[in-house]
């Protein structure tokens, strides 16, 4: 019976991931994106209640929500992948749902890499949650002038300042990529990217 209980919890976790993805991906443009973020955090709380975890140090979080929360981005787990190829960033959803949401009533504004043009399912999901997008080496190549690059960076700074003006936390993985063979979590934190 114990073995079945683990399988059942894993099944409930995966079903919850599917439910979350379908709700977010199929939401309409008219939906309030902050309300959708809160609903998604509540749904992820239910998902993470199916798996064992330990959180330490909540008492060390700042009282004010207007902070930048950095984390090391772990690689996706294949068995959590959806049929359409979407891979959840489970680590960032955990931080938002189980740490920031209970503390601040807000899972934070997340920054995500811009999806490649072949990842339409990913872009739609994060766009509906109103994430701030940044281009990384894992995004499609941008053929842009220095002036265009400067404008893109300026837009990012304006967007993030708007988040602080709303007294919301900002969540980012500044390493610029997920965990890989040459960038394993035991070797983290790696050096931050210049300007991070």
Predicted regions and their residues:
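Soluble catalytic domains of membrane acyltransferases
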Residues: 38-196
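Basic, amphipathic N-terminal segments that precede the first structured/catalytic domain
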Residues: 1-42, 103, 125, 141, ...
């Amino acid at each position: 019976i114990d073995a079945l209980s683990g399988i059942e919890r894993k099944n409930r976790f995966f079903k919850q991931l599917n439910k979350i993805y379908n709700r977010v991906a199929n939401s309409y443009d008219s939906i309030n994106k902050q309300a959708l973020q809160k609903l998604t955090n509540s749904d992820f709380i239910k998902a993470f209640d199916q798996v064992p975890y330990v959180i330490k140090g909540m008492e060390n979080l700042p009282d004010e929500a207007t902070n930048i929360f950095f984390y090391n981005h772990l690689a996706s787990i294949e068995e959590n992948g959806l049929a359409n190829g979407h891979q959840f960033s489970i680590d960032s959803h955990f931080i938002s749902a189980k740490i920031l949401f209970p503390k601040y009533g807000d899972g934070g504004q997340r920054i995500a890499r811009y999806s490649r043009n072949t990842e339409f399912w990913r872009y739609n999901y994060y766009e509906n949650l109103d994430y701030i997008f940044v281009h990384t080496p894992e995004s499609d190549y941008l053929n842009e002038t220095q002036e265009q690059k400067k404008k893109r960076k300026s837009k990012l700074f304006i967007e993030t300042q708007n988040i602080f003006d709303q007294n919301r936390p900002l969540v980012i993985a500044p390493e610029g990529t997920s965990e890989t063979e040459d960038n394993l979590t035991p070797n983290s934190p790696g050096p931050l990217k210049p300007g991070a």
